[in-house]
């Protein structure tokens, strides 16, 4: 049984688009590569054939993964997200207690939508796990691979 995953409608649509491209474009291209490599003769020492079969395996695995994720996805409406505590899809403004001038902001999302470059962190990350369920004013200590982080939650909101 697959765990439920929570996505924004944008995140759901991105996964759906990726699946569409894999099924209707990539899969066909890989099959063409396999057919072309097969035409070269002896398959026992055909690196081109082996590479195409490997690509097919990766493509089919990703298709299966996306189908499972989309089937178990719950699309969250940002308008219905509470801001009394940190939940998935909330944004959090944090004060770094080790460097008081540093204020950072994260939005907690599913692993499938995480993108640290745009401030979207997974609820399953060390920071995400430490923040879930916390309220404004609470201090959190987060153990990460580089050591410990200490933050105070200044604001919880939905973008």
Curated annotation (Swiss-Prot):
Keywords noted in UniProt: Coiled coil, DNA-binding, Transcription, Transcription regulation
Coiled-coil intervals, chain numbering: 45-75
Annotated GO biological process: DNA-templated transcription elongation; regulation of DNA-templated transcription elongation
GO molecular function, one term: RNA polymerase binding
Pfam families: GreA_GreB (PF01272), GreA_GreB_N (PF03449)
SUPFAM superfamilies: FKBP-like (SSF54534), GreA transcript cleavage protein, N-terminal domain (SSF46557)
InterPro entries on file: GreA/GreB_C_sf, TF_GreA/GreB_CS, Tscrpt_elong_fac_GreA, Tscrpt_elong_fac_GreA/B, Tscrpt_elong_fac_GreA/B_C, Tscrpt_elong_fac_GreA/B_fam, Tscrpt_elong_fac_GreA/B_N, Tscrpt_elong_fac_GreA/B_N_sf
Family: Belongs to the GreA/GreB family.
PANTHER family in the cross-refs: TRANSCRIPTION ELONGATION FACTOR GREA
Role noted for this protein: Necessary for efficient RNA polymerase transcription elongation past template-encoded arresting sites. The arresting sites in DNA have the property of trapping a certain fraction of elongating RNA polymerases that pass through, resulting in locked ternary complexes. Cleavage of the nascent transcript by cleavage factors such as GreA or GreB allows the resumption of elongation from the new 3'terminus. GreA releases sequences of 2 to 3 nucleotides.
Name assigned to this protein: Transcription elongation factor GreA
Organism: Pelodictyon phaeoclathratiforme (strain DSM 5477 / BU-1)
Gene field: greA
């Amino acid at each position: 049984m697959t765990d439920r995953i929570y996505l924004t409608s944008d995140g759901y649509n991105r996964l759906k688009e990726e699946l569409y491209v894999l099924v209707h474009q990539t899969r066909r291209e890989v099959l063409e590569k396999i057919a072309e490599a097969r035409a070269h003769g002896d398959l026992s020492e055909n690196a081109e054939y082996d590479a195409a079969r490997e690509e097919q395996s990766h493509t089919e695995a990703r298709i299966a993964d996306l189908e499972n994720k989309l089937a178990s996805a719950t699309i969250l409406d940002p308008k219905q997200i509470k801001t009394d505590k940190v939940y998935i899809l909330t944004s959090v403004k944090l004060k770094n207690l080790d460097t008081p001038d540093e204020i950072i902001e994260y939005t907690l999302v599913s692993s499938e939508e995480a993108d640290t470059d745009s401030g979207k962190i997974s609820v399953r990350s060390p920071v995400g796990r430490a923040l879930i369920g916390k309220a404004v004013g609470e201090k959190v200590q987060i153990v990460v691979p580089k050591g410990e982080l200490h933050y105070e939650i200044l604001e919880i909101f939905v973008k």
